Amino acid sequence: MFDNLSDKLDKAFHILKGHGKITDVNVADTLKEVRRALLDADVNFKIAKDFTTRVRDKAIGENVLTTLQPGQLMVKIVKDELTELMGGETAGVNLSGNPTVILMSGLQGSGKTTFSGKLANYLKTKKNKKPLLVACDIYRPAAINQLHVVGGQIGVEVYSEEGNRNPVEIAQNAIKHAKANGFNVVIVDTAGRLAVDEEMMNEIANVHKAIQPQETLFVVDSMTGQDAVNTAKAFNDRLNFDGVVLTKLDGDTRGGAAITIKSVVDKPIKFVGTGEKMEAIDVFHPSRMAERILGMGDVVSLVERAQEQYDEEEARKLQKKIAKNEFGFDDFLTQIQQVKKMGNMKDLVGMIPGAGKALKDVEIEDDAFKHIEAIIYSMTPGERSKPTVLDAKRKNRIAKGSGTSVQQVNQLLKQFDQMSKMMKMMQGGAGKNLMRMMGGMKGMQG
């Protein structure tokens, strides 16, 4: 995520390395590279220019008051200014109303229908809501089918009316259905277009007027950069939406849309999509995003994701197994599956401070655990619980059954052995304290 921008900003800050203090000259040299990095990231020229002017003024002004090294001071100021540029504070979704009505809008291909499903899943699993998805795209039967498939995946009902060509009527009927059947959130997925046009604007304006949603979200593909920003501006001028959703952020190496959209439309980014899975949705935190752009990672989000997968009862069972030296491949597999639920691997690595930079040339596949799972699934229950029985003949059978090599099987056994030893060591105070801390923090979240 934003790898190109992160690299270029890092090189810009390098100019100040070895300098004892900030001067007009070294600030100008650094900010010239910062501005170039922002322009390469598809940030609007005026926004990039204004941004570097604010950073320069702060750097010169704060220099006499700080004990920070010039490079550290510049990183701090750029982080603070990036945070402000992207909205400053985290903006939550408005869940007032009974039911809460959320109107989804956006261009065709922006990921609007998929995100509608992700939002429904988020509200169901994280906010304890009972959402209803509504199919109002009367032009593309495939969009209605897609929403039904998405609803089936997450266990959320989808309301649609076959043969009805009036999206206003469909939306109004869906809200009546929601009230009659105990749904407390209605997510209305509207028709997308290939470009912003008058017909599309009129239609969604009519739907908006008829159902008076508590929240209107505009979904944009972050990988389209300035096009996304321009589209959002044209749409907001007509509809005056409440917030922006940036999809496909995991594939965006530049970051122009995320950085500039708030200052152009003066509406907050509320959510981001970071993968194809229904769980790949994050509330947008400007300060955390600024830290990730600057290669500082995002430990808070990483811990939050880990806590969501943390099961105190399972942790106790695992602790007992480790104490009795009964940790087996079934337990190892459970740990892998919990990590997978946290999100795609590249995104997780990017949350670890310094890891994104250190591993920038390493290809991190989303199915990084595929071979490990195949090897474990090719073992018998007895072999999984007692790996010491695995001789050459058994390893050969497992390799053939999993489509891997004996070398890969041996490599996994070595990793498993190392992990078992590490977990045994963690049975001491440090490990128990860590488990207690995770449980305590999860309790604090409620």
For each feature predicted by the language model, list its residue ranges:
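Generic secondary-structure signature for well-ordered alpha-helical cores
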Residues: 40, 57-60, 83, 87, ...
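Short, small-residue-enriched loops and turns at beta-alpha junctions
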Residues: 109-110, 139-141, 165-167, 192-196, ...
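Short, surface-exposed connector motifs at secondary-structure boundaries
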Residues: 126-132, 154-158, 184-186, 211-216, ...
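Residue-level signature of catalytic and energy-coupling elements of molecular machines
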Residues: 16, 42, 78, 107, ...
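Long amphipathic alpha-helical segments used for membrane anchoring, targeting, substrate engagement
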Residues: 2-19, 288-446
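Conserved phosphate-handling catalytic cores of large alpha/beta enzymes
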Residues: 171-175, 179, 183, 195, ...
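Primarily NTPase-proximal linker/entry elements flanking Walker-type ATP/GTP-binding cores
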Residues: 9-136, 143-164, 170-190
